[in-house]
C-alpha cells in the first residue's frame, strides 16, 4: 500500500508542476504572514501530554470513518475542546482529503495546522506553505536520508515546522543521522500492514534523546493509553479516528484528555541512540 501511495504521489506532483511552478510559489510566499508555531504550541501546552487532533474522513484500511464529514465544523469543535494543534489530511486518493481544507480551517481557528500527506517532493513543501500549513509531515519509511535532510532544510527555510515520523529503530537511526529533528513522531501503526501497537512508542522513546519532543501517533483510544505513552516520555499525541467516530467531538476530546490538565512532568528517557 505504501508503495502504491508513493507512486500515486509521483504522478500527482508531475501534473501539478505543469501548472503553478515551484518558483512562482516561492515568490508568492514572501508576502505571506508568519506561520503559527506548531512545535511551540505542543511544547508550551499546560497539559502533561499535548494534543494534535486530526481532521480525517477516511483511510485505506478503514474506509469511510466519518460519513457526515464537515472539516470546518470539526475544526470548530476541536477549537471549542481546546486542542493544541490540528492535523489536516490533504491526500485525496486514499484518505479523501483536500488541500483547500487547510485555508478553510485556518480562517476559522487560531491553532497551528499540520498538513498530513505523503511528502515526496520539494514542490509539495512549497505548496504546503502557500496553502496555509504551519507544519509538514515527513515519513521516514518513504524517504532516503538525503531527501529527509533536503526536505527538512527547505521546510525550515520557508518557515514551516517539521514533524518527522518513524516506526522502528532503523528509521529512527536514519533520521537522527540525517538531521537534528525539532519534533519526532512515532507511528504506532505499521504503514505496511496497518496494525497498531502502543509498545512501538514505549520502546522507541527509550532510544530518543530527552531534548527532542516526541508525538505518539495512532491507536490511542482511552485516557489510559494517553497516560501510558505520556509516562514513557511522549510530549504529545496525534489522534484522528477516535474523534471522528464520535458524534460529539468536543466530548470525545475531553474524555480522552481528562487526566492531562497538570503541568508537564520531566520523564526520564535515554540520551543516546
Model-identified regions with their sequence ranges:
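An N-cap/entry alpha-helix motif that binds or orients negatively charged groups
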Residues: 2-66
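Conserved, mostly hydrophobic/aromatic
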Residues: 5, 53, 78, 86, ...
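Catalytic cores of alpha/beta
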Residues: 120-131, 169-179, 220-239
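Glycine-rich phosphate-binding active-site loops on the catalytic face of alpha/beta enzymes
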Residues: 127-147, 185-193, 234-253
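Glycine/Thr-rich beta-alpha phosphate-binding loop at enzyme active sites
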Residues: 60-68, 77-96, 174-205
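C-terminal helical cap(s) of enzyme catalytic domains, especially alpha/beta-barrels
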Residues: 204-207, 245-273
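Active-site mouth loops of central-metabolism enzymes
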Residues: 52-70, 111-120, 163-165, 215-220
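Glycine-enriched alpha-helix->loop->beta-strand junction motifs that scaffold or abut catalytic
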Residues: 82-83, 108-111, 130-136, 156-160, ...
Amino acid at each position: 500500500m505504501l508503495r502504491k501511495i508513493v507512486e500515486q504521489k509521483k504522478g500527482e506532483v508531475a501534473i501539478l508542476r505543469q501548472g503553478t511552478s515551484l518558483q512562482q510559489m516561492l515568490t508568492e510566499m514572501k508576502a505571506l504572514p508568519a506561520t503559527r508555531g506548531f512545535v511551540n504550541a505542543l511544547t508550551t501546552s499546560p497539559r502533561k501530554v499535548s494534543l494534535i487532533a486530526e481532521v480525517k474522513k477516511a483511510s485505506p484500511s478503514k474506509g469511510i470513518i466519518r460519513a457526515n464529514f464537515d472539516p470546518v465544523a470539526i475544526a470548530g469543535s476541536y477549537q471549542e475542546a481546546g486542542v493544541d494543534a490540528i492535523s489536516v489530511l490533504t491526500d485525496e486518493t486514499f484518505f479523501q482529503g483536500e488541500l483547500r481544507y487547510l485555508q478553510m480551517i485556518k480562517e476559522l481557528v487560531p491553532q497551528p495546522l499540520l498538513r498530513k500527506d505523503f511528502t515526496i517532493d520539494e514542490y509539495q513543501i512549497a505548496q504546503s506553505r502557500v496553502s496555509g500549513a504551519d507544519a509538514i509531515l515527513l515519513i521516514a519509511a518513504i524517504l532516503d536520508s538525503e531527501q529527509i535532510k533536503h526536505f527538512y532544510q527547505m521546510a525550515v527555510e520557508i518557515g514551516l515546522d517539521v514533524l518527522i515520523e518513524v516506526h522502528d529503530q532503523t528509521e529512527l537511526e536514519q533520521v537522527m543521522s540525517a538531521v537534528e529533528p525539532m519534533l519526532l513522531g512515532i507511528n504506532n501503526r505499521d504503514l505496511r500492514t496497518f496494525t497498531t501497537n502502543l509498545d512501538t512508542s514505549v520502546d522507541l522513546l527509550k532510544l530518543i534523546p530527552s531534548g527532542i519532543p516526541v508525538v505518539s501517533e495512532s491507536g490511542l483510544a482511552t485516557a489510559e493509553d494517553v497516560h501510558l505513552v505520556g509516562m514513557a516520555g511522549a510530549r504529545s499525541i496525534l489522534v484522528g479516528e477516535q474523534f471522528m467516530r464520535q458524534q460529539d467531538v468536543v466530548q470525545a476530546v475531553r474524555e480522552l484528555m481528562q487526566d492531562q490538565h497538570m503541568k508537564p512532568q520531566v520523564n526520564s528517557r535515554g540520551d543516546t541512540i
